[in-house]
Amino acid sequence: MASLKDLRDRIASVKATQKITKAMQMVAAARLHRAQEAAHSARPYAKRMAAILANLANDVDPIDAPSLMRGTGRDDVHLLVVCTAERGLCGAFNVQIARRAREHIKTLLAAGKIVKVLTVGKKGADILSRDYKALMIDHIDLQSIKRVGFAEAAMISQKIVDLFDDDAFDVCTLFYSEFVSVINQRPVAFGLVPMVSSGGAVETAEVEQKIDNSADLQSIVYDYEPDAASLLDVLVPRNLSVQIFRALLENVAGEMGAKMTAMDNASRNAGEMINKLTVAYNRQRQAQITTELIEIIAGAEAL
């Protein structure tokens, strides 16, 4: 049985931990509001960008479309870009994204495909390296970045473009977590390359589900200057950066939501543990006092 001193030390230790978890919860809550606004603001822009590309693609011969849009025409080598958080203490946030990527890797390997993995975020790299270290070709570290901006998305986009130009892959899929609510973050697989399906329509959807390409925009007839093909040459790389930027913003919002929830649960658990330890301490102290009183009374009677 633990002594009174041991129980006092444990209570003090748990209280100190509870102060830390409460502080982290407050910090995550403050950051969540800003991150949530940024993620929500990026969604319509990314969606409109996809709709514009869909409209442009209808006016351009697939042969004249940028290579990023039409792809290589093969389906042999798959690049998986897995975006997770740089830090932990956010519940199952990172594990869910890595699990989604791992399931996709297993499916591709079972189909005889070649898989390459590019990780963004330390936690995803740590998780995937346990089973698929041989497949990981590079890692992008954003730990020193205090606030993710478009520059970071452009850097990741350029890395993907460089790999594509080197004929390093045929298909590129982006994995991240879509922010649904504070307690709900949904892991998503999003097709980046190619952007054009076999039917000629721009694919800006998840691997399993296509994003709405805004029928109202597609029904409008546009005049392009100098021409649609020239605009695609500029907008396709830009769209790649925009979609990655949106994914990074969604990830930040999801991470803050998961961290706030995890720290709230940790604080509650710490409170329950403090109550249990306090009850144990009081019972043991009461028993000790009772024993001392009995000894005093017994000694007095002996006299």
Swiss-Prot record:
Name this polypeptide is given: ATP synthase gamma chain
Taxonomic placement: Bacteria, Pseudomonadati, Pseudomonadota, Alphaproteobacteria, Hyphomicrobiales
Family statement: Belongs to the ATPase gamma chain family.
Any GO CC annotation of this UniProt entry: proton-transporting ATP synthase complex
Gene3D superfamilies: 3.40.1380.10, ATP synthase, gamma subunit, helix hairpin domain
InterPro entries (alphabetical): ATP_synth_F1_ATPase_gsu, ATP_synth_F1_gsu, ATP_synth_F1_gsu_CS
Residues in the signal sequence: none
Function noted in UniProt: Produces ATP from ADP in the presence of a proton gradient across the membrane. The gamma chain is believed to be important in regulating ATPase activity and the flow of protons through the CF(0) complex.
Annotated GO biological process: proton motive force-driven plasma membrane ATP synthesis
Keyword Chaperone: no
Keywords: ATP synthesis, Cell inner membrane, Cell membrane, CF(1), Hydrogen ion transport, Ion transport, Membrane, Transport
